Each structure stands twice: as C-alpha cells, then as structure tokens.
Amino acid sequence: MANLIPWFTRRNFMTGSAALAGSLAVQAQEHPTASLGAGESFSEYQERRRRELWGLLGDLPWNHKAAPPQRVRTEKHDGYTLERWVLDLNGVEPVPALLLIPDHRQNPTPGLLFIHWHAGQYDLGKEELLLGTSVQPPYAPVCAKKGLVTLAIDSWCFGERKHDANGHRGEEDTFKEMLWRGRVLFGMMMLDEFRALDFLAGRPEVDPSRLGAFGMSMGATKAWWLAALDPRVRLTIDVCCLTDFESLIEAHGLSGHGIFYYVPSLLKHFDTAQINALIVPRAHLSVNGRKDPLTPPAGVEKIREQLLPLYRTYGREKDCLIELFDCAHEELPEMRKQILEWTDRYLVAG
C-alpha cells in the first residue's frame, strides 16, 4: 500500500467513504502542494485542490449576473429536435449553443455536454455535433438514439465566436489580451463550459444526477478538466488528448497544441495525473492513439499507473479505463464501441 497514491506526501489519512475507511500510507513527491494536510480526508483534499485549480485560471467573472438565455430558433431533425440558443455565460460576449432533445427519451433523461475540438477549424465549433469531422463521425444521431439531451457551445474564437477572418490570429490575440487583463483564455473557456453545464442541468428534461462530458482533442482536454473542476460530471469521456505534461515536453509535442492549452504556472502546482485525481472515483474513459503526437504513449501509461490504484482503493477499478489504440489522432470504430458502452452503462442505465 506504500505506493498507492504516488504523488501525495507520506501520511496516514482517513476518508469518510466506506471504501477508503482506514488509514492509507502515501508517498512523497517534490512539490508541497501535492500533499494531504494532517487529518485531511481524500474528499477534503480534492475540494481544496479543486479550489487551487480554479485559482490558476485567472480573474474569472464569478459575480456576473447572467441575462436569461434566449432561444433563437427550433429545427426538426430525424429523431430529435434541435434548439439554437444564445447563452450569457461570462458577461463579456454571448455564447451561441445547440441543444439536442431526442424524440424518445427517459423522463427525466441523462444530459451530455459535447465539447468541440480545435484542429484549426475555427469555423466549425459547436456544429461538430451535427457534422462530425474527418476523423470522427457525427454524434448527433448517436445522442438522439441514446436519448441524451445534448448541449454544445461555441468556444472562444470558434464558430459564431470567431471574430477574425484569420482564426489562428484571433485565438492568439484573444489569449494575449486576456493575459494583459489578468485573465487566462483556458480559464474563460472552462468557465463557459461550467456555466453551460448549469444550463444543461437546469433543463426540465434532464436528470441532473446523470451528466456527462465528452470531447475529442481540445474537447477531450476540456472534458477531463471540467470533470476535475466540477463533481456534477458523472461520466467523463475523452478522445485523443490525455497525456502527462512532462512526457509531452520530453516528446517535443508542445507545438501540437493551440495556445489556449497553456495555463500560466500550472506545472508548479499540478501535473496531469493530479488534475485527473480530482475525478476519482467517478467514471472516466480515456481513449488515445499510440501514434498520436499529442498523446505520447509513455505519458498515457504514466497517468494510468497513477490513477488506477486510486480507483482500486474505492473498489471502482472498472470505472476507470485509459486505453491506447494503434492509431494517430482519430477515433477508431473500436473506440466508439467503448464510448457507447460506457454511455449506456453510466448515463443511460442510470
């Protein structure tokens, strides 16, 4: 048990969970912010670290009083109704959104936050839910068939929030201006997703105890960050964007990510596994490509080796699956099979 939680300071601690009742010896790592406090339970540790993680995301407009959401129009599709909304999530600019409501669904039914990718496709944004990409078929028909009320928003600089004809320049300018003003682009992105989850959870069709976050690439990163920051996320599914930050540096992979990915001072306080430990013991499926430069295999395996013992301690090892497939930055049919199985098990089945 000595190496059970390899990034914590060696202490004995008690947890309120029956699965973790008793004391666990834990091992030291260099940075003191990774340590449990004396007498601190794991859930208390998570809450403290969650606050620290939010604190790294810049000056966020927590006191903003949102205007009521505005439904723009409704469209009928095969198997679902699509509502187009404009949401006030941040007080800086309106956020266009898609809300997919299946014709056949439970009452109440699970909710899914679909988070779009980057890939330099600044025009695509939330429409990825409907259109898919060259490496991932669309999810709208799947969500309709599964009975998932699904929300997708345009991220900063994407879709209807692309304000510069040159999308790359627009993203860099937004990042730099926010930095000057004490804000962090990724922090504002995560605030939008957090507030979007508020909207989804508050829908009358949705069971707020069955919420999932899903995405590929940038969407994957935002999905596991959101789950770490917000315990309401019951199921996290990330596709092709989970690896240890230091492994990414060692593999010279930093240029593969947009500038949004980089949070000032993050590595002084957290590594990837420490962020993902804030999801434990909630369900987490991560599928990645062994040939993907964004997910160096050694970094994926490192996270798996650190997270699985935590899930095992809760008796929930089956609720965490971190996989490597023989592919690059793409979703394989075998990946989608796992994604649908996990969606059925943790959202649809309740």
Where are these regions (language model features)?
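C-terminal catalytic histidine-bearing segment of alpha/beta-hydrolase fold enzymes
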Residues: 305, 310-350
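Gly/Ala-rich beta-loop-alpha elbow adjacent to hydrolase catalytic centers
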Residues: 215-219, 223
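Cap/lid segment of the alpha/beta-hydrolase catalytic domain
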Residues: 115-191, 247-250
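Short beta-strand/loop motif that positions the catalytic acidic residue
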Residues: 286-288
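N-terminal export signals
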Residues: 2-7, 12-30
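Gly/Ser-rich "nucleophile elbow"/oxyanion-hole loop immediately N-terminal to the catalytic nucleophile
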Residues: 172-216
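N-terminal cap/lid segment of alpha/beta-hydrolase-fold proteins
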Residues: 65-105
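Mobile cap/lid helix-loop segments that gate and shape the active-site cleft of serine hydrolases
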Residues: 179-180, 195, 235-276, 281, ...
